[in-house]
Amino acid sequence: KVIGKENVLDPETTRISQVDGVLKSIGMGYKKIAVTVVSADDTIKLREVESQHPEVKIYIFVAHATEVSKEDAEVILDHADVVTGCASRYIRDIGTERGFFRAGDSIPIFGITEDGKKFLEIRIEKIGGLKEKKDAQIPKPLI
């Protein structure tokens, strides 16, 4: 399938901006938008965009959070729907401390919101349930 220039954020430079991509999607009439981000700042900006467009629901997935600071981990866990723990000590510790829905041991994935939890439950069902791992290996070191 051809995407088409009209559906690309900036066909000339092909720049990537999750926030601007979501704004473009809203401008194209989309009401339910899923977006993956890696920065705490983007989670804040996306929730601001969502608050300015009450008819739109933005589902925020955070990946590659290995080296986030404690402060950024808290921001991410305050704003995202689904977060991968990667090798992040702070995402893992704070996510566990707050009691978020969790799937997996080696690389945990947290369902932060009810929607995030539902996304994970649907995926778990599709793969036939969680499999218990004997001696699950976590990344070392956690950073």
Q: Where do the model's predicted regions map?
A:
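Conserved mixed alpha/beta catalytic, RNA-binding, or beta-rich assembly cores of soluble enzyme
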Residues: 1-143
